[in-house]
Amino acid sequence: MNKKKAGAAFIVLLTCALAGQALAQGPEFKSNADDLAKIRSMLEEFRQDIIHKDGYAITKLMLNPNVLFHHTNTQEEIDSARKYNAQFDGIGPSQLDGFAKLLATSKDKLEEKFRNIEIRQDGPLGLVTFNYDFVINDKVHHSGLEVWQLCKIDGQWKILSVAWTIY
């Protein structure tokens, strides 16, 4: 009889633990396969625009020309910039125009390779993170972590910000 009570108590405790875990996870993201596929397609479009050196096409992926598009500066870079501008915040103006111009004018073979891609989406908000290698003439020039924020507006996904590390 004690074995039956112990077994029943175990099942009750296990059920409570599983129910508690499910409740602790919070609400599910409002995500769907179609939006995730469209976001993944944007990544490939971005990559192909670099290969084809189409800076204009990259700017069309952005929500507007003023999006944050910048690498994160090291503390040494920030300290150096603050010698000339005490208010330097570590980011500075967007580098989107400069990147688009680089693509349009470079004679080098360019490519950005992505790996460890993670895409999260909750309704009209998307987040993409990945490791990247920026390749010039078939040699890795620099690598890092890249983070995109996206929003869905008028039925289309657009990039709100792109930030990355460089090493």
Predicted regions mapped to residue ranges:
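Sec/Tat-exported extracytoplasmic proteins
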Residues: 43-54, 62-66, 100-103, 107, ...
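Bacterial N-terminal signal peptides that target proteins for export
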Residues: 1-10
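Short beta-strand edge/turn micro-motifs at domain boundaries
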Residues: 25, 127, 142-167
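Short, solvent-exposed secondary-structure junction/capping segments
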Residues: 48, 60-79
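Short, low-complexity N-terminal intrinsically disordered segments enriched in polar/charged residues
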Residues: 22-61
